[in-house]
Amino acid sequence: CMMFAVIASWISPAWLVALEGQPWAGLSQPVRGFSIWLGTFCLSLLIYFMTMHNHMGILYYPWQYFTAICPPYWEHFAETVSANFHVAWIMCCTVVVWFMEGIWERFPFTMIKTPWLRRLALFFGIIAISWALCMFFWYMQELVWGDAIRGHRRDAAPDWRWLHVGETAIFFLVPALFLQFYCGNWPNRFSTPINVLVRSLLVTLGGIAIYCLYYKYA
């Protein structure tokens, strides 16, 4: 359930932010809401089977070769058979959606005037930015804590590291939401690129502070 919820937490807001609620944006409620909910459910279910289901197949002995890809296809890249690898980049997607709607004001994708091109560029742009963040946080952990060791437990284990890549992304979401909801998305007096840059710097500093406090005392 948690893994499915992680996917839905990305797809549901992305459908409104990136795809602008299309193709049901012109419908009245509750038809529009139910249609987007159903679309979110179906797409999340498809992504679940592509990313998380194989993890379920290795939880049993012997591995469930007839119901899932065993070992999972991401094993060699992620250095683990755990679906925490997918949890990591999908959690980053959720965070980037909120960044895009809040502190970034969908910039620079708002400069694309063709509606269908803007929506697709924003949707896949969120995924691309999320992958970049995911890889950055992974290598940041290796710089701080050393290389991940497959078979190790706790903070040196690759599956633990991937999970905490997603959690690190959440650390940066906290100051972004604070800035958006409690500070009126400050600053607003400059041009959009300058506003976005200043907000991003503030969120970066806030995220680093939370990261340091969490791993020092948690």
Regions found by a protein language model. Name each.
Residues 1-8, 34-35, 45-49, 68-95, ...:
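Alpha-helical transmembrane segments of polytopic membrane proteins
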Residues 6-12, 129, 206:
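Transmembrane alpha-helices
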Residues 8-35, 61, 94-121, 143-148, ...:
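Cytoplasmic membrane-interface regions of multi-pass membrane proteins
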Residues 28-46, 115-133, 192-209:
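Transmembrane alpha-helical segments of multi-pass membrane proteins
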Residues 46-69, 132-150, 209-218:
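Membrane-helix interface motif
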Residues 151-218:
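Intrinsically disordered, low-complexity segments enriched in Gly and acidic/Ser/Thr residues
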